[in-house]
């Protein structure tokens, strides 16, 4: 079966059931999920798929919208710990700064699952599973396409403007790294401007219009 980023979240719910202790089998499983926000149509569909997967699995879902703020996710995770949920899952706003709250979840013996985005922590045992994409490879693929396209006109050089996602998020960091890796050493491909669009249509449009005005 071909897994998309949307139905991988359904798999996350299945994974949650798998990591929960058998003792929970006699009662509905309770999962606390902290979503990044509702910054795009994709994220809205992502949230809908999570809620649908929980309903179909008979899971009691406690849902929290972080509104793209890490501090809101930390508060939500601590609330889930206080409520003694069986599993915590979240799609992290940014990549770093999670060690303390994840240690609290581990101390409470509540397994944590990362969905869509990864984190950087000092101890990998602070979460039990990551279900998501290889964002570095996504960046490489975009760059490979550009490299192949550039070969059609070898006499031309290309100035690149880069529209990034949320500052500090795994997708933004990793896609940039993968893209830069492939174009490194190619003198005909040069990134001249780079700015965040916060993964929103409105901000992305605003930034791209500014790019076109200043560089177009």
Annotate each language-model stretch with its function.
Residues 20-22:
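N-terminal signal peptide c-region/cleavage motif recognized by signal peptidases
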Residues 10-15:
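Sec-dependent N-terminal signal peptides
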């Amino acid at each position: 079966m071909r897994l998309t980023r949307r139905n991988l979240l359904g798999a996350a719910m299945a994974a949650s059931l798998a990591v929960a202790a058998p003792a929970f089998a006699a009662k509905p499983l309770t999962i606390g999920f902290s979503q990044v926000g509702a910054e795009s149509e994709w994220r809205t569909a992502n949230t809908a798929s999570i809620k649908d997967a929980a309903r179909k699995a008979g899971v009691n879902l406690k849902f929290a919208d972080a509104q793209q703020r890490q501090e809101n996710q930390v508060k939500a995770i601590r609330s889930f710990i206080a409520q003694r949920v069986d599993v915590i899952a979240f799609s992290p706003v940014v990549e770093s700064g999670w060690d303390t709250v994840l240690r609290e979840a581990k101390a409470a013996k509540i397994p944590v699952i990362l969905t869509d985005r990864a984190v950087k922590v000092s101890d990998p045992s602070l979460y039990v599973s990551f279900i998501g994409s290889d964002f570095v490879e996504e960046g490489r693929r975009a760059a490979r396409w550009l490299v192949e396209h550039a070969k059609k006109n070898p006499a031309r050089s290309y100035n690149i403007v880069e529209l990034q996602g949320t500052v500090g998020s795994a997708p933004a960091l990793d896609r940039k790294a993968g893209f830069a890796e492939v174009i490194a050493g190619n003198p005909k491909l040069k990134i001249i401007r780079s700015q965040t669009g916060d993964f929103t249509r409105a901000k992305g449009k605003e930034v791209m219009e500014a790019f076109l005005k200043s560089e177009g």
